[in-house]
């Protein structure tokens, strides 16, 4: 069985966010096996695909090294990249059946465009301990699936060195649980993107994620309102890599656009365990 490593939301290899994607299965492997392989891969996400009777429709599940995720943008883009580019699936649009409903991906020039549910955040008080964990006091805090800490400027975002142990237990009013915080600011003048962010997810076993599609389901509604824009470019400033997304508000949905690059193809030397 083949597995690929794809750099998603990237401008080239060794950029963006790597995800592992398995060749599609006829039946789901055992959950424990999928979790064990995700831990072995030790990437932020490993994506598993399931064939259906329709050539353009697949089941899709995402596992971090420690648990199954309810939604993952970069691994969805990676899965679509594998189907389109590595396996030659010749359809106009892919549909994925997931824990977050049906997600669609289509080609958009040299990018892939994903249609995800919007997660408009609500303004909230600064949770106890958050400023200390981040090492900076946010100007504003918002809550969607993740906490969103708005800070003064891009330099603050880039220089942040949070206490991940302390951050892991802070959830505030976030619906996705503790230990998942986006730190964000408007970009510096002259940047070719409008918003810059970083995403820390020690609660999911991920100290920092290089490029996070699901976070932009929160950030696009938030900064679309702040900046009066229906479409924005975002940069996720993970040190040494960085991820780039174009996002568009579509009411209850958000369109996420980005590119994927295949950096590795490998062969598993074991058979998947079954439930």
From Swiss-Prot:
Class of the enzyme per the UniProt entry, highest EC level: isomerase
GO molecular function annotation: isomerase activity
GO biological process terms, alphabetically, are: biosynthetic process
Q: What EC number(s) does the entry state? A: 5.1.-.-
Q: Which InterPro entries match?
A: Phenazine_PhzF-like
Q: Does the keyword Cytoplasm apply?
A: no
Q: Which cellular components does GO assign to this protein?
A: cytoplasm
Q: Which UniProt keywords apply?
A: Isomerase
Is Isomerase one of the keywords UniProt gives this record?
Answer: yes
Where are the catalytic residues? 45
NCBIfam families cross-referenced by the UniProt entry: PhzF_family
According to UniProt, the name of this protein is Uncharacterized isomerase CC_3221
């Amino acid at each position: 069985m083949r597995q690929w490593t794809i750099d998603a939301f990237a401008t080239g290899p060794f950029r963006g966010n790597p995800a592992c994607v398995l060749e599609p299965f006829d039946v789901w492997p055992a959950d424990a096996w999928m979790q064990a392989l995700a831990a072995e891969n030790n990437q932020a996400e490993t994506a598993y695909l399931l064939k259906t009777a329709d050539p353009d429709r697949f089941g899709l599940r995402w596992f971090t090294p420690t648990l199954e995720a309810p939604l993952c943008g970069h691994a969805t883009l990676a899965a679509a990249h594998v189907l389109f580019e590595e396996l030659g699936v010749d359809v106009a649009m892919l549909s994925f059946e997931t824990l977050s409903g049906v997600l669609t991906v289509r080609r958009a020039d040299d990018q892939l465009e994903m249609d995800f549910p919007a997660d408009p955040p609500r303004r909230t008080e600064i949770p106890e301990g958050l400023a200390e964990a981040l090492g900076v006091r946010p100007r504003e805090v918002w809550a969607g699936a993740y906490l969103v800490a708005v800070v003064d400027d891009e330099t603050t975002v880039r220089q942040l060195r949070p206490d991940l142990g302390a951050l892991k237990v802070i959830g505030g009013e976030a619906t996705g649980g503790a230990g998942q915080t986006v730190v964000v600011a408007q970009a510096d003048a002259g940047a070719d993107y409008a918003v810059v962010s970083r995403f820390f997810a020690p609660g999911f076993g991920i100290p920092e994620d290089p490029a996070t599609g699901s976070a932009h389901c929160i950030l696009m509604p938030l900064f679309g309102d702040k900046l009066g824009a229906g479409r924005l470019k975002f940069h996720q400033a993970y040190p040494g890599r960085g991820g780039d997304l174009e996002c568009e508000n579509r009411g209850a949905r958000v369109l996420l656009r980005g590119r994927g690059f295949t950096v590795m193809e490998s062969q598993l030397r074991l058979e998947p365990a079954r439930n």
